[in-house]
């Protein structure tokens, strides 16, 4: 499942600036939204391929393969593991929240972006590869070392998105920004789905099914008994990122060196812009209410993504094979969520669309935590020894099938909410201040990024229950939903 990109001021400002420049320069070459020569087709596609490079990390490490392995096998206790995973992600979220505005200011200063991207890729690739040595017991990396690696990768991943976003206005022709942005998202989704299918074919199904096209043994000598089919997610993510980041580094043009503000001046100017816009929010209470609402429900949705695989693995004792299929199913249905969100928005308006999406997510989460191997919907007991639905080595019981059905709906609603949220701000913000408010929109997506994981981690530890920890996300969704009800779907008038 792919989280919708939160565009920073540079990206969103391009939407306004596009009309200020002619479609082509004097030499007939298309101009970008910044007025410079746009990249050629190879450079544009290479920019989009960077999403193909980055997205498998999210699915393999953060959601479906490595995180459940870490919490259940390396830590060895699903409850303690979920609490630790919450703490790890809350620390990463806090670092991102503190530094993202500074990095955003540097990116918006107009200097070179590719050196920064090279640094972040250079950090992410080896740190992710090193997760291969995350083994249970004393022979592998310690839990503390693994935690540090995860925090480093998560922070570098978030910062790489800031600089990748900021390249878009100078790479794409001013009439193709939307197309190129969409191409990047599509490639990101496709890359994640492809790598999950490859993991299924190469490492998860061999030896588990007798289908003719499936190898008898895991490829490359992977030893499933040593959990290498889960640990390989680290090296695959790292190598995938490194090699598919190369096209951007080689073929996508960067801005030339110029007399732009230095690092310190860029940070100072960017901070001043953020503070100025925050102060102006008192004149735009309706927009401010929406941004605060979005901050809460976005944190809740992100927490569901981060902990969904961890929770399912702990409650149902799913192995790597089942989790991989689980990820593939959700990724496919999440694509439909984007279309569903668009239909809701066009038919009922952004506010109703968001209310339906958040409400559907909350109801789905409540239903999800109501299902366990011994209980359906909190009140209906279920015999865990009841006959299986089928002989396949995944989703073979009624509770598992019900859980997957509910989580499929959650995936659809979350994707729809991400799509509707950006449209809602476009309907509310003053037309002449769209760039500034989309900058705040991006900031609201990171300002409390630590909150969801922190709540889940604390609640899991306090109640010693994965169900209680996962259910605590309902608090964030509820606050966000309540605040959205207070928002009026009308455009604010700019105040100078």
Residue ranges and their predicted role:
Residues 28-45, 253-291, 388-394:
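Juxtamembrane intracellular "pre-TM" segments in multi-pass secondary transporters
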Residues 109-123, 346-360:
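Cytoplasmic membrane-interface "Motif A"-like loop-to-helix N-cap segments
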Residues 127, 140-160, 379-416:
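Hydrophobic core of transmembrane alpha-helices in multi-pass small-molecule transporters
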Residues 133, 242-250, 371, 470-496:
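Multi-pass alpha-helical transporter architecture, strongest
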Residues 203-239, 390, 397-398, 458-477:
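A membrane-interface helix-boundary motif in multi-pass transporters
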């Amino acid at each position: 499942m792919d989280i919708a990109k939160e565009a920073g001021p540079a990206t969103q400002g391009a939407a306004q600036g596009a009309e200020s420049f002619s479609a082509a320069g004097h030499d007939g070459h298309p101009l970008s939204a910044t007025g410079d020569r746009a990249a050629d087709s190879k450079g544009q596609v290479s920019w989009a391929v960077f999403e193909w490079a980055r997205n498998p990390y999210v699915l393999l490490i953060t959601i479906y393969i490595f995180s459940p392995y870490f919490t259940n096998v390396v830590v060895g206790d699903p409850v303690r593991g979920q609490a630790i995973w919450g703490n790890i992600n809350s620390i990463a979220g806090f670092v991102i929240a503190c530094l993202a505005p500074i990095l955003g200011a540097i990116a918006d200063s107009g200097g070179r972006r590719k050196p920064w991207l090279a640094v972040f890729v250079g950090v992410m690739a080896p740190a992710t590869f090193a997760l291969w040595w995350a083994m249970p017991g004393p022979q592998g990396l310690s839990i503390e070392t693994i935690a540090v690696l995860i925090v480093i990768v998560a922070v570098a991943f978030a910062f790489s998105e800031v600089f990748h976003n900021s390249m878009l206005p100078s790479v794409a022709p001013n009439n193709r920004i939307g197309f190129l942005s969409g191409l990047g998202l599509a490639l990101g989704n496709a890359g994640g789905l492809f790598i999950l299918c490859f993991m299924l074919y190469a490492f998860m199904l061999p030896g588990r099914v007798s289908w003719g096209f499936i190898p008898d043994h895991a490829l490359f000598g992977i030893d499933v008994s040593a959990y290498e089919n889960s640990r390989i997610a680290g090296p695959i993510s790292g190598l995938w990122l490194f090699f598919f980041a190369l096209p951007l580094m080689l073929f996508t043009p960067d801005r030339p060196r110029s007399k732009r503000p230095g690092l310190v001046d860029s940070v100072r100017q960017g901070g001043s812009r953020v503070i100025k816009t925050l102060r102006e929010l008192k004149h735009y209470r309706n927009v401010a209410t929406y941004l605060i609402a979005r901050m809460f429900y976005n944190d809740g949705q992100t927490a569901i993504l981060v902990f969904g695989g961890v929770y399912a693995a702990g409650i149902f004792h799913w192995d790597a094979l089942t989790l991989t299929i689980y990820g593939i199913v959700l990724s496919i249905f999440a694509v439909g969520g984007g279309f569903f969100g668009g239909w809701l928005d066009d038919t009922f308006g952004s506010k109703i669309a968001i209310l339906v999406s958040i409400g559907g997510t909350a109801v789905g989460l409540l239903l999800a935590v109501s299902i366990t191997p011994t209980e359906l919907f909190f009140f209906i007991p279920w015999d865990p020894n009841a006959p299986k639905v089928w002989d396949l080595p995944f989703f073979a019981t009624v509770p598992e099938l019900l859980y997957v059905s509910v989580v499929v709906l959650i995936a659809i609603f979350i994707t729809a909410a991400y799509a509707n949220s950006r449209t809602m701000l476009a309907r509310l913000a003053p037309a002449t201040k769209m760039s500034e408010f989309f900058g705040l929109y991006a900031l609201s997506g990171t300002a409390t990024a630590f909150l969801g994981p922190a709540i889940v981690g604390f609640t899991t530890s306090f109640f010693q229950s994965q169900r209680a920890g996962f259910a605590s996300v309902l608090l964030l969704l509820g606050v966000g939903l309540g605040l959205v009800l207070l928002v009026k779907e009308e455009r604010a008038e700019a105040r100078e």
